[in-house]
Amino acid sequence: MKPTEEKSAPKAHATRSSESGRQGFILDLWGVRYQVEDVSRSVAFYTKQLGFKLDHQKLPAFAQVSIGNLKLILSGPGASGSRPMLDGRRQEPGGWNRVVLQVADLPARIEALKKAGLRFRNEMEVGPGGRQIQIEDPDGNPIELFEPAR
């Protein structure tokens, strides 16, 4: 590259224009962040119980695990992604928004996970889109297991 040439910025994925004509600024989905109390415990849960792969970790504050195209960012106390909000509210584990993971043979998965001692939020639900059930990670963060209708 010549000294007068500038390196071009990465190109964003094509996005729909807003009404004002500007392009979107979102480049891509990075991942989903869950607040956790114990990063090591959460890594063990996601890798051993659900088959995630450990990408990297900086204990005790942070780890990233993945499965397929999903990156799950686990932020423990002290991580930059866990700091209090401007109004003082603490980011805490739990809630109702959740990661939805597709599975095959949901009843068999439920049976195996119950034998492993996982916590369930509900019984299996069946609807027009498929079957689902919610489990919790060790910090109470919800995870939905979903089997699409055939």
Where are these regions (language model features)?
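Short glycine-/small-residue motifs
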Residues: 142-145
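Mature N-terminal segment immediately following signal peptide/propeptide cleavage
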Residues: 34
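Conserved active-site tyrosine of GNAT-family acetyltransferases
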Residues: 42, 46-47, 113, 140
